[in-house]
From Swiss-Prot:
Record's catalysed reaction(s): L-glutamyl-tRNA(Gln) + L-glutamine + ATP + H2O = L-glutaminyl-tRNA(Gln) + L-glutamate + ADP + phosphate + H(+); L-aspartyl-tRNA(Asn) + L-glutamine + ATP + H2O = L-asparaginyl-tRNA(Asn) + L-glutamate + ADP + phosphate + 2 H(+)
Gene assigned in the entry: gatB
Record note on quaternary structure: Heterotrimer of A, B and C subunits.
Name the UniProt record assigns to this protein: Aspartyl/glutamyl-tRNA(Asn/Gln) amidotransferase subunit B
InterPro entries: Asn/Gln-tRNA_amidoTrfase_suB/E, Asn/Gln-tRNA_Trfase_suB/E_cat, Asn/Gln_amidotransferase, Asn/Gln_tRNA_amidoTrase-B-like, GatB, GatB_C_1, GatB_Yqey_C_2, Gln-tRNA_amidoTrfase_suB_CS
Family matches, as HAMAP family: GatB (MF_00121)
GO MF annotations, alphabetized: asparaginyl-tRNA synthase (glutamine-hydrolyzing) activity; ATP binding; glutaminyl-tRNA synthase (glutamine-hydrolyzing) activity
Keywords: ATP-binding, Ligase, Nucleotide-binding, Protein biosynthesis
Residue stretches spanning the membrane: none
Enzyme category, top tier: ligase
Protein EC: 6.3.5.-
Organism for this UniProt entry: Shouchella clausii (strain KSM-K16)
Length: 476
């Protein structure tokens, strides 16, 4: 029997407002525990929440960028549950009237485009954070309590772990481009839960779903779903039944582990938040927010192809993150050739960042520095090989590329007279290679070019070297 995989994702994104959603407490990551709190965040008796309008703007902007319909009449509700990270014993969220509904984003996997529906985007407050000690005690930090948060719920349109990965990449890029969140998973500003079920191919009814948690990276989402897909298939093929349960992904063992079995759906006893009136969003408000949405990744990608002549793949990679795309834009504004800038960013820059496990802003490289180096290549001042030495200095220590070339004596040798003398010396020392080349062994030319580069410490102009080698060999 063959099965179809059904996946839905719930993504929580913290909004980077200056203050929290219902209080004036600072909304900044990294403060000492329990210092960014107030009596409102902690639910003291008699205090009242005041809605942060900027958080509403940000939620609307995110919803619009995800092609959602924006509600005209929306409200907040109390989601009741008891847990140590929830000091009020309820969370202010949205139940039946979310701020955005019926959205979608388009992903591409294996060269095929697919639209993934978004059921809803609603605004709520985040909970505190528990830290579990090895001594059996747990500590709670309420700095995160009351942070404005949007929950983005996808339709069950995702069919493979690879599609889930592509959806998350695209969603993150769109949110980052709007500027409403930095989406840093390592800081908890983007978190994801996944729901997965299997059904026999051709069956309309969904199978029993499993919820996956502890998915701390997009790669873990993909790996967790891959494991769970195989686990459920094995259970069904052996005649077993899938339980409705919550499982966590164990990265060390690359498997999912049972956390708890759900006997029914959670009953949070939602009811309207009595301390907040309904929120009415008129057309003027909607249009003001819509006018603030910047160019989004798909539009920027299309522009790179149509106006800059970049291949579609290059444009896709460059626009995956706003940080990389903005860096590329600034580099070409500094006068660099667009294709060369793209090649360096996708090649040497990404390779360095991946090897060092760094973000681009954590390196010393600047758009002006990269552009300056590229202009030295196009002017013939340095070769592409020498440029790699300059690049290493730029990305590790920064500086002016022209000064680096000057200080390290890296200027490309393009003087024909000087190179012709070195060519003669190389040919005199490698008579066999001349004979091999004349006998049709093209690799001999590559060997001679290598000897020239060795003799000049990589500073010889490679195009001129090829020309002079061929000329001098013809004379012999």
């Amino acid at each position: 029997m063959n099965f179809e995989t059904i996946i839905g994702l719930e993504v929580h994104v913290e909004l980077k407002t200056d203050s929290k959603i219902f209080s004036s407490s600072p909304n900044h990551f990294g403060a000492e525990p329990n210092t960014n709190t107030s009596v409102i965040d902690l639910g003291y008796p008699g205090v009242l929440p005041v809605l942060n309008k900027r958080a509403v703007d940000f939620a609307m902007k995110a919803a619009m960028a995800l092609n959602c319909q924006i509600a005209t009449d929306t409200k907040f509700d109390r989601k009741n549950y008891f847990y140590p990270d929830n000091p009020k014993a309820y969370q202010i969220s949205q139940f039946d009237k979310p701020i955005g509904e019926h959205g979608w984003i388009e992903i591409e996997v294996g060269g095929k485009k697919k639209r993934i529906g978004i059921t809803r985007l609603h605004l709520e407050e985040d909970a505190g954070k528990l830290t579990h000690g090895t001594d059996g005690h747990s500590l709670v930090d309420y700095n995160r309590q009351g942070t404005p948060l949007v929950e983005i719920v996808s339709e069950p349109d995702i069919r493979t772990p690879e599609e889930a990965y592509a959806y998350l990449e695209k969603l993150k890029a769109i949110i980052q481009y709007t500027g409403v969140s930095d989406c840093k998973m390592e800081e908890g500003s983007l978190r994801c839960d996944a729901n997965i079920s299997l059904r026999p191919i051709g069956q309309e009814a969904f199978g029993t779903k499993t919820e996956l948690k502890n998915l701390n990276s997009f790669n873990f989402v993909r790996k967790g779903l891959e494991y769970e897909e195989k686990r459920q298939e094995q259970v069904l093929l052996s005649g077993g039944v899938i339980e409705q349960e919550t499982r966590r992904y164990d990265e060390a063992g690359n498997k999912t582990i049972l956390m708890r079995v759900k006997e029914g759906s959670d009953d949070y006893r939602y009811f309207p938040e009595p301390d907040l009136v309904n929120l009415y969003i008129d057309d003027n408000w909607k249009e003001r927010v819509r006018s603030e949405i910047p160019e989004l990744p798909d539009a920027r990608k299309d522009r790179y192809v149509s106006e800059l002549g970049l291949p579609a793949y290059d444009a896709h990679v460059l626009t995956l993150t706003k940080e990389m795309s903005d860096f590329f834009e600034e580099t070409i504004r500094e006068g660099a050739d667009a294709k060369l800038a793209s090649n360096w960013l996708m090649g040497e820059v990404l390779a360095y960042l991946n090897a060092e496990q760094k973000e681009l802003q954590e390196s010393a490289l600047t758009p002006a520095g990269l552009a300056g180096m590229i202009k030295l290549i196009t002017s013939g001042t340095i070769s592409s090989k020498i440029a790699k030495k300059v690049f290493k200095e730029l990305i590790e220590n920064g500086g002016d590329p022209e000064q680096i070339v000057k200080d390290k004596g890296l200027v490309q040798i393009s003087d024909e007279g000087e190179l012709r003398k070195i060519v003669a010396e190389v040919l005199d020392a490698n008579a066999q290679s001349i004979e091999d080349y004349k006998n049709g062994k093209d690799r001999a030319l590559g060997f001679l070019v290598g000897q020239m580069m060795k003799a000049t410490k990589g500073k010889a102009n490679p195009q001129l070297v090829n020309k002079l080698l061929l000329e001098e060999m013809d004379k012999r």
